[in-house]
Amino acid sequence: METATVLSIFISSLLLGITGYSIYTAFGPASKDLRDPFEEHEE
């Protein structure tokens, strides 16, 4: 394969991995531990 093909596949999979991890962090089981600064600062 050409270098450009390998590089584009690598960058695409890296972006997909980061997106998947951020969605899992935001909505997965670990989201219960996240703090919400807007709820802490209600008056």
UniProtKB/Swiss-Prot annotation:
List localization entries: Plastid, Chloroplast thylakoid membrane
Q: How does it sit in the membrane?
A: Single-pass membrane protein
Q: Does the keyword Signal apply?
A: no
> Where would one find the signal peptide in this protein?
none
Superkingdom of the organism of origin? Eukaryota
Tell me, what is an example of a GO biological process annotation in this record? photosynthesis
Q: What does this protein do?
A: May play a role in photosystem I and II biogenesis.
Official protein name in the record: Protein PsbN
Q: Which organism is it from?
A: Porphyra purpurea (Red seaweed)
